[in-house]
């Protein structure tokens, strides 16, 4: 299945309004490890949530922009004023187990750099829509795929 999974942050609220925090989160995630653990090694690491088939919008130079580097992630968090990390909750659609499994791996990787992640299962698209309409600033997990 061609599927892009991503965590979407509200860049207007702390701590996600800080570019160094967002960069730290990128460096903290080992995308290849996720594919190895969740998809039996299948998949392609992307540098954005734009599917490569959308060639007009996909930027291949982003693929290697943030290589897995937990030391760099910790350094950026400290520079951003979070030397001990911070707490965050990620809302994840619970209607598809691979989303939940992937979110658990991401949470573990973020915890390794000091970001204490709690996963909040949501009842699929309806729960996510309610959360978005309510203006909740919580990070959200989302996945999408191209439709022929």
What are these regions (language model features)?
Residues 3-47, 74-76, 87-99:
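Alpha-helical secondary-structure segments
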Residues 49-50, 69, 88-91, 122:
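Beta-strand segments within the central parallel beta-sheet cores of soluble alpha/beta enzyme folds
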Residues 24, 28, 37, 76-80, ...:
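Generic, well-ordered alpha-helical scaffold segments in large soluble proteins
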Residues 2, 31, 50-51, 124, ...:
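Beta->alpha turn/N-cap motifs
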Residues 90, 102, 108-148:
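Periplasmic binding protein-like
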Residues 45-79, 96-101:
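Structural transition elements
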């Amino acid at each position: 299945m061609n599927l892009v999974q991503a965590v979407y942050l509200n860049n207007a609220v702390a701590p996600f309004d800080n570019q160094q925090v967002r960069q730290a989160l990128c460096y903290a995630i080992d995308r290849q490890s996720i594919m190895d653990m969740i998809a039996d090694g299948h998949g392609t690491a992307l540098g954005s949530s734009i599917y490569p088939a959308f060639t007009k919008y996909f930027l291949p130079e982003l693929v290697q922009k943030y290589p897995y580097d937990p030391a760099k992630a910790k350094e950026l968090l400290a520079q951003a004023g979070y030397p001990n990390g911070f707490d965050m909750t990620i809302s994840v659609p619970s209607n598809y187990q691979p989303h939940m499994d992937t979110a658990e791996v991401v949470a573990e990787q973020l915890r390794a750099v000091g970001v204490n992640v709690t996963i909040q299962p949501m009842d699929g698209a309806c729960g996510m829509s309610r959360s978005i309409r309510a203006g909740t600033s919580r990070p959200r997990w989302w996945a999408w795929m191209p439709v022929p």
